[in-house]
C-alpha cells in the first residue's frame, strides 16, 4: 500500500526508532558527539527531545541547498530562543556562516498617503522629524498638482539631511506599489492652498524606516516567492525596495526537508522613540536578523531585552563582557572579504538609522535605504 498521506510505514518507523536508540545509547555512554544525524528529520528529533547539545556543539556546521548554492549554517546556540508554537520548548539556532546577499532594509518612504482622493490644486506641508539644514527643517512649502491623486495614492518628496528641500521634486503615485509617476512638480516656500497635516517623518522620507517589523528585508527573509512577487507594503508610506523586481525570496529554491524543520521563533525588537513611541515589537518568523544584544553588543535601550547573547558570540568573543568594539568573532565574510551586515535593531534615537556590524565587528548604524549584507538566522524546532 502506498504511503500517500505522509504517515511513516512500519519499516520507516522502525528505522527512525533504531536511529534514535543509537543516539540515546551513544549519549548514555558519553559518546553523543561521535554519532551524527543523516537527515534534517534526525536533527529535529534530537532538538525536540532536548538532546541536540549532546550530539552537536556550538560552532558545528550543517548545510542545505538553495537551488545550486550550498548554504553553510553555524550552530550558534541551544535553547536560547522561544518557539512561537507553545507545544515545543526546545530550539537549536543556526546562522549563515557568511553573508548571503546585500539587501536594502527599507526604501525611502512617501510623504503623504491619500486616504481619499486628493483633488488637483495647491497644497502646503511642513515636514517634521528632520534636520535644520535639510528636509524637515521646520519651514513650510507649497506645491500645485494639476492631476488628482487617487484614493490609496501617495505623494513622495525625498530629500537629504544637508540639502535644501527645494532641490528635490515632488512626485505622485497611484499606490504604494506603483512605480509609474502621475506627475512631477516643483515645490516653493509658502503657505498657499490647503494644508496637508498627516505626514510621514522627514527622516524616513529621505532614508527609509528603521522599523524591523514593517521592513522590506523581513518580508524578503520569509518569502518563497519569485522575483517581482516578494514585496508587499507593510504601511501606507512604504515604497518599493531597490530589489523589488530582481530578488526572489530568501526561502525560494531552498531544500524542502530543511524548511520543514525550521519553526517560527518569537523575537522582540525595540522601536525608535522618535516616531514609533519606543517600547518593542514582537515578531514570529522562520528567518530573522540578529539583534545587537544577541551579538554580544549590549542593549539599545535598557528597558527592552532583544533576546539573549548567543554562545557563539559571547563565548568566543575578543572580550569578556558585552561590547561594541572591533571583535573578530563578529566579522562576516563574502567571497573572502569582510562585510557590513544588518542587525534588526534600530538606532533608537532616529527613525531611519538601523544598527549593523561593520567589517571589523564594531557596532555601527546607517540609513535603512542602504543595501548591506544579511546573514539570516533560524531555529530547528
Regions found by a protein language model. Give the residues of each.
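Collagenous Gly-X-Y triple-helix signature in extracellular proteins
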Residues: 21-381
Amino acid at each position: 500500500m502506498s504511503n500517500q498521506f505522509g504517515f511513516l510505514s512500519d519499516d520507516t518507523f522502525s528505522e527512525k526508532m533504531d536511529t534514535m536508540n543509537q543516539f540515546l545509547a551513544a549519549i548514555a555512554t558519553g559518546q553523543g558527539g561521535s554519532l551524527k544525524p543523516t537527515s534534517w528529520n534526525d536533527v529535529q528529533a534530537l532538538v525536540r527531545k532536548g538532546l541536540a547539545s549532546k550530539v552537536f556543539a556550538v560552532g558545528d556546521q550543517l548545510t542545505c541547498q538553495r537551488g545550486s548554492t550550498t548554504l553553510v549554517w553555524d550552530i550558534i546556540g541551544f535553547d536560547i530562543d522561544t518557539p512561537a508554537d507553545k507545544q515545543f520548548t526546545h530550539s537549536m539556532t543556526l546562522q549563515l556562516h557568511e553573508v548571503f546577499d546585500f539587501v536594502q532594509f527599507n526604501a525611502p518612504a512617501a510623504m503623504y498617503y491619500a486616504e481619499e482622493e486628493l483633488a488637483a490644486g495647491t497644497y502646503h506641508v511642513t515636514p517634521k522629524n528632520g534636520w535644520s539644514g535639510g528636509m524637515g527643517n521646520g519651514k513650510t512649502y507649497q506645491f500645485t498638482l494639476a492631476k488628482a491623486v487617487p484614493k490609496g495614492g501617495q505623494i513622495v518628496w525625498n530629500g537629504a539631511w544637508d540639502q535644501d528641500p527645494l532641490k528635490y521634486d515632488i512626485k505622485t503615485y497611484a499606490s504604494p506599489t506603483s512605480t509609474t509617476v502621475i506627475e512631477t512638480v516643483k515645490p516653493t516656500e509658502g503657505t498657499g492652498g490647503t494644508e496637508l497635516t498627516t505626514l510621514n517623518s522627514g527622516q524616513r522620507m529621505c532614508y527609509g524606516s528603521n522599523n524591523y517589523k514593517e521592513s522590506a528585508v523581513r518580508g524578503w527573509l520569509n518569502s518563497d516567492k519569485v522575483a517581482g512577487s516578494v514585496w508587499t507594503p507593510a504601511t501606507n508610506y512604504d515604497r518599493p525596495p531597490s530589489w523589488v523586481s530582481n530578488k526572489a525570496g530568501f526561502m525560494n529554491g531552498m531544500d524542502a526537508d530543511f524548511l520543514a524543520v525550521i519553526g517560527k521563533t518569537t523575537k522582540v525588537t525595540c522601536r525608535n522613540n522618535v516616531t514609533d513611541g519606543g517600547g518593542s515589537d514582537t515578531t514570529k518568523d522562520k528567518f530573522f536578523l540578529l539583534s545587537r544584544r544577541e551579538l554580544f553588543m549590549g542593549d539599545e535601550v535598557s528597558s527592552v531585552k532583544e533576546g539573549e547573547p548567543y554562545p557563539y558570540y559571547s563565548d568566543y568573543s575578543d572580550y569578556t563582557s558585552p561590547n561594541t568594539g572591533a571583535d573578530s568573532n563578529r566579522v562576516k565574510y563574502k567571497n573572502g572579504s569582510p562585510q557590513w551586515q544588518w542587525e534588526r535593531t534600530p538606532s533608537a534615537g532616529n527613525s531611519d538609522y538601523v544598527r549593523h556590524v561593520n567589517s571589523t565587528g564594531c557596532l555601527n548604524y546607517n540609513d535603512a535605504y542602504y543595501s548591506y549584507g544579511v546573514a539570516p538566522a533560524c531555529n530547528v524546532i
